[in-house]
Amino acid sequence: MAELRAALPAEIKIHYAMKANPMPAVVDHMAKLVDGIDVASANELKVALDSGANPHDISFAGPGKRTEELQRAVAAGILINIESFREITELRAIRQATGWQVRVAVRVNPDFELKSSGMKMGGGPKQFGID
C-alpha cells in the first residue's frame, strides 16, 4: 500500500471495496491502510463499522438498497450513493422523520460513450445510477 500511495498524487484517496473480501479480519486490516471503505449491504456496513472505520469514510453504493439499510446508514453518518429516484424519496422521508443529516452522492450515467475505452455507462435505464 505504501508503494501505491507513493505513486499517486496526495489528493487521491484509496478505498477498499468490501465486495472484494468482506471477511472481518481482512476488513480490520485494510481499514488501517486505506482512506475509506465502500460497502454494498447492511452486513458489510456492520463489518466496516465494527472494524473501527470512521463512518465519515464509509460509502454505501449498489442498487436496491432497502429502507432499513438506508436508515442504518443515515443514522451512522455514512455517505450514500443515490442510484434511483426511489432512494431520493426514501432518504427525504428518513430526514423528515428523524431530523438526521443525510450525506449523499449521486451516481449519474451520462448518455455518451468513452471513445476507445470499450465502456458505455449510460444511454438508457440501468440498475446502477440515474440517467
What is the meaning of each model-derived region?
Residues 1-8:
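A short, N-terminal amphipathic alpha-helix
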